Amino acid sequence: MSSILPFTPPVVKRLLGWKKSAGGSGGAGGGEQNGQEEKWCEKAVKSLVKKLKKTGRLDELEKAITTQNCNTKCVTIPSTCSEIWGLSTANTVDQWDTTGLYSFSEQTRSLDGRLQVSHRKGLPHVIYCRLWRWPDLHSHHELKAIENCEYAFNLKKDEVCVNPYHYQRVETPVLPPVLVPRHTEILTELPPLDDYTHSIPENTNFPAGIEPQSNYIPETPPPGYISEDGETSDQQLNQSMDTGSPAELSPTTLSPVNHSLDLQPVTYSEPAFWCSIAYYELNQRVGETFHASQPSLTVDGFTDPSNSERFCLGLLSNVNRNATVEMTRRHIGRGVRLYYIGGEVFAECLSDSAIFVQSPNCNQRYGWHPATVCKIPPGCNLKIFNNQEFAALLAQSVNQGFEAVYQLTRMCTIRMSFVKGWGAEYRRQTVTSTPCWIELHLNGPLQWLDKVLTQMGSPSVRCSSMS
């Protein structure tokens, strides 16, 4: 590695020798991109070494990296950005960006108060875990601290541990197979399939005070990401709960199928593309479907035509586009970031305007009507799907018959509008009345449903030429 600074201390060179390299980058620009990455890494390590020398923790960092041992001590730096990087204005770690992927001038502060260092910004533990352990790390959602880390990022102490071996990658939980009878004896009486397409959805504000139902969120997001702690207040839920009730995860009170039949396990498998996204303007589909292969992607209003981590709506043309749609498109901006991590899907509003989400899985978690539309303000994120919750529902629905399983297909579709909301509290009461919106199809759950339905056979209600 060629030296890119006037002087590179030996300890920096040693630490850089342990840097994990991402997979080979193809294309003509690969060499230039790798050179820029090496420059960034050297500056990041040199900045950290300079700070740790003052506190005497440098040896512990080198020990942790060279031995790759999680039993090493915490390697801490002050949790204020100003102390970390020598700036005079205090700027708490809570204001760091979660990814470190945006480009800005070196050692400057952005208008929103977050700090950029050497053309990038990010949470310090994410930066150094990416550098020394997981080059493909996207977000702090993918990390959880080990139990004996006293200064883990999620503890929000005055100092934060950046020992890369004090963090673990969040693993995707293995979903148990669903046991499906070869020929299901369907219940004689089943509840009718709910149809929400023609009803006016209710609205609710972002659930800032709701306790999450899953332990797979490894760390509390910074205050800028309004978290889901506490209990729901009446003011937050602008909806009437007597219009519908979520499906319960408790055992059904209906009689189950005949268990003397041959049960076949149907397993879940991850698809090559975890979701497909279609873009609409009012009731018209615009452009091609975007197939998401990366665990983190953004849907924005810009114009990059060939990035697997971005679905850029600014490229798409529509001869029927009216002035309202055109104006709305200009306000999409950075749009929404979608994460698929540990079997969970998160939506983060990056735009300066709110986004509006209709997720039946999320609505059930919070006890809302299945068609409720949730407003996510700028800078906030929300878990919009959970594979384990879906697996529990699927296992229960198999006992209720073909129609109950088929109804779960609606849970695998998530609708999201930009800038303009819809529902009972808005002038626009259907998603097809909003100027710009997208529809996500979650491919893994949909393919799992397909395999289960194929195994189950036919629905109980027969369809004849006379029906």
UniProtKB/Swiss-Prot annotation:
Subcellular location(s) of the protein: Cytoplasm; Nucleus
Q: State the protein's purpose.
A: Receptor-regulated SMAD (R-SMAD) that is an intracellular signal transducer and transcriptional modulator activated by TGF-beta (transforming growth factor) and activin type 1 receptor kinases. Binds the TRE element in the promoter region of many genes that are regulated by TGF-beta and, on formation of the SMAD2/SMAD4 complex, activates transcription. Promotes TGFB1-mediated transcription of odontoblastic differentiation genes in dental papilla cells. Positively regulates PDPK1 kinase activity by stimulating its dissociation from the 14-3-3 protein YWHAQ which acts as a negative regulator.
In its UniProt entry, the species of origin is given as Mus musculus
Q: Which gene encodes it?
A: Smad2
Q: What is this protein called?
A: Mothers against decapentaplegic homolog 2
Q: Domain MH2, which positions?
A: 274-467
Q: Which family does it belong to?
A: Belongs to the dwarfin/SMAD family.
Q: What is the lineage of its organism?
A: Eukaryota, Metazoa, Chordata, Craniata, Vertebrata
Q: Where is this motif: PY-motif?
A: 221-225
What's noted about post-translational modification? In response to TGF-beta, phosphorylated on the C-terminal SXS motif by TGF-beta and activin type 1 receptor kinases, phosphorylation declines progressively in a KMT5A-dependent manner. Phosphorylation in this motif is required for interaction with a number of proteins including SMURF2, SNON and SMAD4 in response to TGF-beta. Dephosphorylated in this motif by PPM1A leading to disruption of the SMAD2/3-SMAD4 complex, nuclear export and termination of the TGF-beta signaling. In response to decorin, the naturally occurring inhibitor of TGF-beta signaling, phosphorylated on Ser-240 by CaMK2. In response to TGF-beta, ubiquitinated by NEDD4L; which promotes its degradation. Monoubiquitinated, leading to prevent DNA-binding. Deubiquitination by USP15 alleviates inhibition and promotes activation of TGF-beta target genes. Ubiquitinated by RNF111, leading to its degradation: only SMAD2 proteins that are 'in use' are targeted by RNF111, RNF111 playing a key role in activating SMAD2 and regulating its turnover.
**Segment Disordered: which positions?**
207-251
The record's InterPro entries line, in alphabetical order, gives: Dwarfin, MAD_homology1_Dwarfin-type, MAD_homology_MH1, SMAD-like_dom_sf, SMAD_dom_Dwarfin-type, SMAD_FHA_dom_sf, SMAD_MH1_sf
